[in-house]
Amino acid sequence: MPRKTSSQPRPAEPKAVLHPRNRHSGRYDFPKLIAACPELGEYVILNPYGKQSIDFANPDAVRVFNRALLRQFYGIQHWDIPAGYLCPPVPGRADYLHGLADLLAADNAGVIPRGAAVRVLDIGTGANCIYPLIGHREYGWRFTGSDIDATALASARTIVAANRLDKVIELRRQDTSTQLFKGILAADERFELTLCNPPFHASQAEAASGSQRKWRNLGKLDPSRKLPKLNFGGQAAELWCEGGEAAFVARMADESVAYAKQVYRFSTLVSKGGNVAPLMVRLQRLGALQVQALDMAQGQKKSRFVTWTFLDAAEQAAWRTERWPRS
C-alpha cells in the first residue's frame, strides 16, 4: 500500500543557539563593528535578504571581520594573520571555551574559577592565537599555546606582544610532529585544562577537496569567478595529518596517560561525529574517568568536544583546594 504523504509543510527544526554567555548571539551590529574597525566598511555587502554582511568566500573580508569582532567584543586592538593560515569563526571558538568553563564550574559549586591561577594548554594554537585571546579576556585564565609551525608561532607572538599579553599568554614550539604533550609540558607543571582543534583531514588532497566543497556551499562557485587560491604549504598542520582527525585524537588519548596527574581536564574538539564513540571507548580502556562528549551548535553547524580526566574524586578535590581561587 502506498505510503501516505502529508500536504502540510514540516516545521523547521529550531535553530541551534550559542552558549548563553557567548557574546555573539543575534545578528551582528555592523555599524558598531565598523566604528571599532573602520576598514571593515570596505568589505560590507548586502545579502539576498537586504541585510548587511560580508562575502565569507573572500579571505581578506573574513580576516578583517574577525579583527573587528575581537576588537569590539574582547578589546583586542591588534590582530592579523599571514596569508594562507586558518581564520577561525570567533563565535564557535568562544563556545568551546564557555563549555570548558562550565565543566570547571560544575566541580566548584557552580562558580567558574577565574584568574591566572587557572592554567590552560592550547595544543596547536595556530597563527591566530584565538583561544588564548578569548579565554583570557573572558575568564582571566593564563594560557600556554603550542605549535609545530614556526611561522604560526611568530604570528601568534606578534599578536600577544602587540596587545601586551606576554605575562598571561606563553607560546612554545613543538619540535616533534608526532608529539602533543611531550616536549611541551615540564614535569613540574600542572594545567586545569587542555584544549585542541585537531586537523580534520587525512591528506592534502582531501583538505583541498573539502575547501572546494566549502566554497560551493557558500554559493560562490560560478564560471566567472575563480575559487580562492589556498596556500596548503602554510596550512598543512592546521588542515590535515596522517590518519586524519581519528588518528590525531587517538594519539592524544594515548599520550595523555603519561600526564594523568598533571592535568585536571583534558579535552579536544571532534568535528566528525563518527569519531566520538571510538575515542570514548579508547579513553575508557586507558583508564580515563568522567569521559564525556558535550554538544555545541552554531547556527546550522553542530560540533562537540570530548573531555576526560585521570584524577579520582579525592584527587580532584585536593587539586581544587590547592589551586583554585576561593570565591
From Swiss-Prot:
Localization in the cell: Cytoplasm
Q: Which reaction does it catalyse?
A: adenosine(1618) in 23S rRNA + S-adenosyl-L-methionine = N(6)-methyladenosine(1618) in 23S rRNA + S-adenosyl-L-homocysteine + H(+)
- Alphabetically list the UniProt keywords: Cytoplasm, Methyltransferase, rRNA processing, S-adenosyl-L-methionine, Transferase
Under InterPro entries, the record lists: METTL16/RlmF (IPR010286), rRNA_lsu_MeTfrase_F (IPR016909), SAM-dependent_MTases_sf (IPR029063)
Q: Where is this region: Disordered?
A: 1-24
Give any single GO term for biological process.
rRNA base methylation
Please list the GO terms describing molecular function: 23S rRNA (adenine(1618)-N(6))-methyltransferase activity
Q: What is its EC number?
A: 2.1.1.181
One of the record's GO cellular component terms = cytoplasm
What does this gene product do? Specifically methylates the adenine in position 1618 of 23S rRNA.
Q: Which family does it belong to?
A: Belongs to the methyltransferase superfamily. METTL16/RlmF family.
Q: What is this protein called?
A: Ribosomal RNA large subunit methyltransferase F
From which source organism is this entry? Stutzerimonas stutzeri (strain A1501)
